[in-house]
Amino acid sequence: MYIRTLIVLCLVTVFVLGGLPVSTTHADTFRPVVRGKRGVVAGGQPLSVEAGLRILQRGGNAVDAGVATILAASVIEFSHFSFGGEVPILIKLKGQKVVVIEGMGQAPMKATREFFVNRAHGGAPSLTTRKGGLIPSTGPLSATVPAVLDACITALDQFGTKTLAEVMEPAIQLADGFPIDELRVQYIRTRSPIFSQWPDAKRVFLPGGEVPKVGDIFVQADLARTLREIVRAERLASKGPRNNRHAGLMAARDYFYRGPIARRIGDYMQANGGLIAAGDFARFAAKVGQPVQADYRGYQVYKAGFWTQGPALVETLNMLEGFDLKKMGHNSPSYIHTLAEALKLALADRDRYYGDPDFVKIPMTELLSKNYAALRRPLIDESRASLAQQPGDPSNMKAVLASAVQTIGRASALPEIERANDTTCVNVVDKDGNLFSATPSGAWLPAVVAGDTGVLMGQRLQSSLTDPNSPNVVAPGKRPRITLTPTLVLKGGEPFMVLSTPGGDNQDQALLQVLLNVIEFGMNPQEAVEAPRFDTQHYVSSFDDHEFLPGSLNVESRVGLKTIEELSLKGHKVKVQGEWGTLSAPTVIIYDPSNGVASAGADPRRSRYAVAW
């Protein structure tokens, strides 16, 4: 009876955590810390995290639950992420090393730099036609190979215990119909002028030609059928006396990437002005790679590699280790200034050096070294904000690259409804202290729906550039450098924390602040995500028309007027964002190996969710 009651209470917590902050449930937070001993799931929507909790209750581990949460989110969080997108994943199983699932699809083989530079008008509709060599922000030309399914299958096969059918069951049920919420209705309404140009997208998201009403049962029948076909392929291959789980998973993968689904998507995209073909699907495989690592004051902070922006957090932590941040005081003018200036330096290196390591040579060891950080640290002027973009010269171990060309500041000219729509997050800790952190993204509204497959196609190719001197220049079969950046932390080699967030280029800025809130200032996970934040846009944007806003600093008003005034006096171009105005919205789970209790925080800025068992 006790266990049944506890489960019910935890499920109720999903919905309690769902609303905007209206009352104080802790001395310093709007929401309570969510704690459990058998497992915790945190993510972006209550039905998504319930899917993961369901798998934990059925004996699955953190990987099984994380994959179930991702797949459920790919159905119901389509405003920010869906099945045709991408998802980098960090995993730490008991007794094993930290690994990263490189869940980022490649550019189509027809996606050459010359194609985008030379075309006057692309095959996309007029609203998404980009001139001047820019890659469209949405439409058929912006898609890379969908990576979600292969990343999930790879994680299950090598680190999970469940079948795809088991972890995909909640997603299929949700595709059959779920009560649509306010956020999804808003995105359908505001993005309909773009996606209505693609008949299948209009058919799916405007049933009967109308925007759904909040609470309507929203059905994705084509997607449900596709998911069932994939599961059927798994079941047929795994039948027999040995009940071969691996064979079933590989059959499911092949059905999507080498079988009828790939052919149908490829045919549709080719017929509608896109570049992706069935052969691009067949060439893709999500690799299991090694993460990069920062050692910061006894904590080991793991990030995905240089095909993401994750190493920028490592660079930033290496620089900040030379400062007494506690003495500065949390969110004091000197604290915010120091973090912002360190981030500017790290992001300048990102823009200058990061890209797909399969295609470009990157001075990885030097960029991540403490010696390089020591060279860069003195560039942080404690009294003045930098307005210059200053990449370093790690190959020659010099603080500044002498030949660096300054990027001209420019604001985005794209209409709001055409801009990138962001991301979600998934974090899981199970009863054994296994850790799972993922940042699912892509294939958000407005998106092309690939015919009768029901699969929304991604827009990540826009993160590639056409500058031939950039390590992130577009090329056939090359991955765009992405902003998606899950985080996994050990303390003295023991499991300690997982955290991830939406927020585009600002993801690592938010995660840095949450991480330091815990490590430097001893905050609990809910305090850490609710504390006032800031971000700078002093970088070349990874999206849209790649704006650059030198010296910009967005600050939530809760830091206080005096702090805002002092930051302005230092030369920051401060924009006050309101009390809860920054773009990011992390979830974080902290694990205590001494008693097996996991504690979660979920950001109220975008109604993140956490549940415990």
For the regions a language model picked out, list residue spans one by one.
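Bacterial N-terminal signal peptides
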Residues: 7-19
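Noncatalytic scaffold domains of N-terminal-nucleophile
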Residues: 26-50, 54, 62-63, 67-251, ...
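Alpha-helical support elements that line or immediately flank enzyme active sites
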Residues: 55-56, 150-158, 251-258, 263, ...
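Active-site rim segments in enzyme catalytic domains, especially the processed small/beta chain
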Residues: 76-82, 88-102, 107, 116, ...
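Internal maturation/activation junctions in enzymes
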Residues: 209, 241, 262, 274, ...
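Short loop/turn motifs at secondary-structure junctions and domain boundaries
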Residues: 284-285, 416-421, 479-480
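Extended C-terminal subregions enriched in glycine
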Residues: 432, 478, 511-512, 520-581
